[in-house]
């Protein structure tokens, strides 16, 4: 059976004053590390997003399609559209 934790109130699960005092010296260091790591992650994400939004895919050739195949695809699309309503 688990022992009750002396650093948390067993009814409210709030930290005890001793636990708060023990964590206090690390708070700003942890927030700084979080800010740095979060900033790096966000900057990589935004750089990638902006880089990908600049590409217009003009250099990718579109394969030719027959008119009959195009008509069949349009019919299939319209049927699925009607079924989803």
UniProtKB/Swiss-Prot annotation:
Compartments reported by the entry: Mitochondrion inner membrane
Main location: mitochondrion
Topology feature Mitochondrial matrix, residues: 1-25
Membrane topology: Single-pass membrane protein
Name the UniProt record assigns to this protein: Cytochrome c oxidase assembly factor 3, mitochondrial
Record topology, Mitochondrial intermembrane segments: 49-85
GO cellular component, one term: mitochondrial inner membrane
Family assignment from sequence similarity: Belongs to the COA3 family.
PANTHER family: CYTOCHROME C OXIDASE ASSEMBLY FACTOR 3 HOMOLOG, MITOCHONDRIAL, CYTOCHROME C OXIDASE ASSEMBLY FACTOR 3, MITOCHONDRIAL
Gene designation per UniProt: COA3
Any one GO biological process: mitochondrial cytochrome c oxidase assembly
Organism field: Komagataella phaffii (strain GS115 / ATCC 20864) (Yeast)
Source domain of life: Eukaryota
Transmembrane segments: 26-48
Key words of the record: Membrane, Mitochondrion, Mitochondrion inner membrane, Transmembrane, Transmembrane helix
Oligomer and partners: Component of 250-400 kDa complexes called cytochrome oxidase assembly intermediates or COA complexes.
Task of the protein: Required for assembly of cytochrome c oxidase (complex IV).
